[in-house]
Curated annotation (Swiss-Prot):
It catalyses: L-aspartate = fumarate + NH4(+). It is an enzyme of class 4 (lyase). The keyword Lyase applies. One of its GO terms (biological process) is tricarboxylic acid cycle. The active site is at S316. Its EC number is 4.3.1.1. This is Aspartate ammonia-lyase. L-aspartate binds at T99, S138, T139, N140, T185, S317, K322. Gene3D superfamilies: Fumarase/aspartase (C-terminal domain), Fumarase/aspartase (Central domain), Fumarase/aspartase (N-terminal domain). GO terms for cellular component: cytosol.
Length: 468
């Protein structure tokens, strides 16, 4: 055991661990979610990149010596490589605007650096968590900058599963291009379309959301490093701000820049609201698609039954043979959670006061949660559902030609009123629109056959109005 102290007192720390007294206090104070920092490696890596960039800038400015720079950078590289992540034990939701997370990072890096230099853990006179690792920084610029770097990476990582889903929908659109079916508005028969057109809209929806995700990265490119406490830059070197921008670009390989006004950037959480809004947009639209898939596959005998979803597992403990649309159902629920997380982000952003928003920990927690579950849900929907969807072509075809909705195709030829009369009689007699129109000799068989050709009902079509 080793003894560490702070201005509150002292505590015994196990010699096996790399965190220190402030981390231990935080772990005892905040047992809220049981989701610890170690559950989010992207945040640990981005925070380590911030600390490495700071060490490089501080060394160049002569604020720390070369030996310390090398040791701190070595420790940061270990964290970026995924090592020692079990040492990050603070709860994701915490009081103090993220200070506990920042100090967990400072203490682990300091003790890793001490070992690298041949010292014992806790010998902070050689490498101090605050004086050396946290030099030229405050939690108030280090935490949000690390968070934005992590969000940038999560946005980038979300693109691949979204592209896979888009491509799966596009492939189904090609497969189903010849399958004519009934389009519906307000759950009532409308006009014909193809199943391919339906799936093409899903592919386009995802493609547009991919554009939104890529654009959202620009909202988190602007950091507030060098602002320290409230953005004024107290306790930082006059050249630190320009230098840290170059160093963070070198360390991350990403086009991050420092905000023009660090005071505004330190208190602003607008970028998080925008990113969360994009995730909510994806969730809302994805949930609607899952609603469609569940409805289109309903049945098999007493529903629409236009498509078949892959059978994943038995659906009932009491009804033999029942299979449920479990994949769209789970994605629906993920989308509900993402939408709820967005509300939490909005409330936390609104809750800021004066020069700092202390609620960034819950913003970080909710955003990371949304990224994780939404990414997994998209992959699950792609591989366990969309790729295996098949069409019930005869059912789709019969719905069209037994539908009252195709009477709309007669409108340009015989007018609305006569078309409505035919629809009314077809409903009353349980006969087809085609048979009623033919029987009344309103149009010839050749004319009706031409009007009701699928290709003439699926897109704009030139016509001549037939005389009464």
């Amino acid at each position: 055991m080793r003894i560490e102290h702070d201005f509150i007192g002292q505590m015994e720390i196990s010699d096996e661990v790399y965190y220190g007294i402030q981390t231990l206090r935080a772990s005892e104070n905040f047992f809220i979610t049981n989701d610890k920092l170690c559950s989010y490696p992207v945040f640990i890596k981005s925070f380590a990149q911030v600390k490495k960039a700071a060490a490089l800038a501080n060394a160049q400015l002569g604020l720390i010596d070369e030996k310390l720079k090398i040791a701190i950078c070595h420790a940061c590289d270990l964290l970026v490589d995924g090592k020692y992540h079990d040492q990050f034990i603070v709860d994701m939701i915490q009081g103090g605007a993220g200070t506990s997370t920042n100090m967990n990072m400072n203490e682990v890096i300091a003790n890793l650096a001490l070992e690298y230099m041949g010292h014992q853990k806790g010998e902070y006179q050689f490498c101090h968590p605050n004086d050396h690792v946290n030099r030229s920084q405050s939690t108030n610029d280090a935490y949000p900058s690390a968070l934005k770097i992590a969000i940038y990476e999560r946005l980038s990582n979300l693109v691949a599963p979204m592209k896979a889903l888009r491509d799966a929908f596009a492939q189904k659109a090609k497969e189903f291009a010849h399958v004519i079916k009934m389009g519906r508005t307000q759950l009532q028969d409308a006009v014909p379309m193809t199943l391919g057109q339906e799936f093409e809209t899903y592919a386009l929806m995802v493609d547009r959301d991919i554009e939104q995700v890529l654009d959202a990265r620009n909202w988190v490119r602007e950091l507030n490093l060098g602002g320290t406490v409230i953005g004024t830059g107290i306790n930082s070197h006059p050249d630190y701000r320009s230098l840290i921008e170059k160093k963070i670009q070198e360390v991350t390989g990403r086009p991050f820049v420092m905000a023009n006004n660090l005071i505004e950037a330190t208190q602003s959480t607008g970028a998080y609201v925008q990113v969360s809004g994009v995730l909510k947009r994806i969730a809302v639209k994805l949930s609607k698609v899952c609603n469609d898939l569940r409805l289109l596959s309903s049945g098999p005998r007493a529903g629409l039954n236009e498509i078949n979803l892959p059978k994943m597992q038995p659906g009932s403990s009491i009804m033999p043979g029942k299979v449920n649309p479990v994949i769209p159902e789970v994605v629906n629920q993920v989308c509900f959670a993402v939408i709820g997380n967005d509300l939490s982000v909005a409330l936390a952003a609104e809750g800021g006061q004066l020069q700092l928003n202390v609620f960034e920990p819950v913003i970080a927690y909710k955003l990371f949660h949304s990224f994780v579950i939404l990414g997994r849900a998209i992959e699950t929907l792609t591989t366990k559902c969309v790729e295996g969807i098949t069409a019930n072509e005869k059912i789709c075809h019969d719905y069209v030609f037994n539908s009252i909705g195709i009477v709309t195709a007669l409108n340009p030829h015989i007018g609305y009123e006569k078309s409505a009369m035919i629809a009314k009689e077809a409903l009353k007699s349980d006969r087809s629109i085609y048979d009623i129109a033919l029987e009344k000799k309103i149009l010839t068989k050749e004319q009706l056959d031409d009007i009701f050709k699928p290709e003439n009902m699926l897109s704009p079509h030139a016509f001549k109005k037939h005389k009464d």
